[in-house]
Structures are given as structure tokens and as C-alpha cells.
């Protein structure tokens, strides 16, 4: 699975490291980028299961970011899907959204994936939706699953960090909300962010909007880059991986 952050701007006023929008005239180019990236990764031995078209598409301040409302993503998936199929990559899933349960409190973006599924052509190419837990509640997935139970749901990002270092509480709450909460609502899998960071919370982008206080699932000591400390997300993932069988 991979998520993308890009900054291809729509006009001069959007010429920024953050919050630009993708020109419709660049849809073919962006789709070709996906094709070439997947081909290179597979050549290196990585089997790409799924992609999202933009990480946190409603986040104007991410590092780096591109604003991609559902209206834009609805049109781009109609270009990306055929491009992947033409390149023999039709088995790579395309997941919509990849953002928070509360749609970043943007009223016009509520039901983001459902709005895209309502378009017959977009529906054909969209395999499911991806979700983060930085805002809103996992119960948002109830409607998403009930309305389109045939479409996949993946949880694709949550972080731990300095803002709440309580190991026990994070361990229990995250397993309850992220793993059990999504899987019982049709979830197909969980990805946590990041897998590993060092004891200085890096590496991270120096640009505004990057997380400089996040922990990895594992912390590696920067003095030797050998000694590791297992954090709550490591134990969450280890437990789920031990008891959930592939294909379940």
C-alpha cells in the first residue's frame, strides 16, 4: 500500500508547497506517475497492493500537500483506473479519500467516498476507501459500510507521540478503536504511521506541517542505530498480526 503527497498547482495563486490543486490537464501525467512508480517498486521486489490518490486530501497544511476535494478525486479516478489497467496493473486497488472520519469539518466534503461511488464510472474504478483517526469517530464507517458493503475499507494512518505518551492508555484505546473498531465495520486492514523513528522523532521533513513530535511503532537509538524500544503501536500490530489470519 502507498499513499501520495504531491503539489501540482492549478494556477499561480496556488503555487505553494501546500494546498495546491491538480490541474485537470495534468491528470494523465499524474496517472502515468503512478504507473511508473508501481512498475519500479515491483521491479525492486515490492508487491503493491493498493494506492490512494492523495494523502489527507482535505489537509491544507500538511508537508507537502495538495487539496483534492471529492469532486476532483471523482474525475481523477476515471483517469487513473484505465491507466493502471492499460499497463497491466489492474490488480492494484485504488482507495478513495485517505483522511479523517470528520472530513476535517468541511461540510461540503461529508460522505466523501459515497459521493464518488454515486458516479457510475468512478464507482467502477474505486475499490474502496481509506481512513485516519485524527478527527471524528470510527462510527462514521457504519454508514460507509452499510451503503456500499461491496467496497473495501482500510485504516491507513494513526500516530502516537509526545502529546500523549501514556503507554497503557494508548495500547488499549488504539487497539479498541483502530483495530476492533474498523475491522468490525468491514475493515480489511490497518496501517500505522510510522513503523520506525529514532529517539529524536526523525527523520521528518523540515517544512511546516510535518510531525516533529511523533513516535514510531519502534524507536531506534540514534547513537548506534541498533538498539530499539518497542512502543504501543508495535504491540498493537504484533497482537493483531498474531491472531488474524491472512484472508480472514
Question: Where do the language-model regions lie?
Answer:
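Glycoside hydrolase catalytic-domain groove-lining segments
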Residues: 82-94, 121-164, 178
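Substrate-binding cleft/loops of secretory-pathway carbohydrate-active enzymes
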Residues: 99-127, 138, 147, 163-171
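A structural motif
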Residues: 46-48, 126, 187
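Surface beta-strand/loop "capping" patches
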Residues: 247-248
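Solvent-exposed loop/turn segments at secondary-structure junctions
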Residues: 1-5, 54-60, 99-103, 132-137, ...
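Hydrophobic residues within beta-strands of alpha/beta enzymes
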Residues: 49-51, 129, 190
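Aromatic/acidic polysaccharide-binding cleft in carbohydrate-active enzymes
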Residues: 152-244
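Substrate-binding cleft and catalytic face of glycoside hydrolase catalytic domains
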Residues: 1-119
Amino acid at each position: 500500500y502507498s499513499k501520495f503527497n504531491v503539489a501540482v498547482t492549478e494556477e499561480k495563486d496556488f503555487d505553494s508547497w501546500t494546498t495546491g490543486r491538480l490541474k485537470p490537464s495534468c491528470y494523465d501525467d499524474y496517472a502515468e506517475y503512478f504507473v511508473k512508480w508501481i512498475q519500479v517498486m515491483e521491479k525492486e521486489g515490492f508487491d503493491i497492493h493498493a494506492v490512494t490518490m492523495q494523502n489527507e486530501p482535505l489537509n491544507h497544511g500538511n508537508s507537502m500537500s495538495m487539496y483534492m476535494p471529492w469532486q476532483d478525486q471523482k474525475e481523477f479516478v476515471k483517469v487513473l483506473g484505465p491507466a493502471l489497467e492499460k499497463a497491466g496493473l489492474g490488480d492494484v486497488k485504488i482507495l478513495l479519500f485517505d483522511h479523517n472520519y470528520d472530513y476535517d469539518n468541511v461540510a461540503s466534503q461529508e460522505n466523501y467516498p459515497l459521493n464518488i461511488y454515486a458516479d457510475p464510472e468512478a464507482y467502477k474504478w474505486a475499490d474502496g476507501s481509506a481512513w485516519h483517526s485524527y478527527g471524528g469517530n470510527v462510527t462514521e464507517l457504519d454508514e460507509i459500510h452499510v451503503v456500499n458493503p461491496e467496497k473495501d475499507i482500510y485504516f491507513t494512518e494513526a500516530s502516537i507521540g509526545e502529546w500523549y505518551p501514556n503507554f497503557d492508555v494508548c495500547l488499549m484505546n488504539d487497539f479498541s478503536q483502530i483495530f476492533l473498531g474498523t475491522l468490525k465495520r468491514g475493515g480489511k486492514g490497518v496501517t500505522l504511521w510510522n513503523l520506525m523513528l529514532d529517539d529524536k522523532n526523525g527523520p521528518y521533513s523540515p517544512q511546516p506541517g510535518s510531525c516533529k513530535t511523533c513516535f514510531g511503532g519502534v524507536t531506534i537509538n540514534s547513537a548506534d542505530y541498533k538498539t530499539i524500544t518497542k512502543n504501543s503501536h508495535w504491540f498493537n500490530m504484533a497482537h493483531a498480526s498474531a491472531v488474524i489470519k491472512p484472508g480472514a
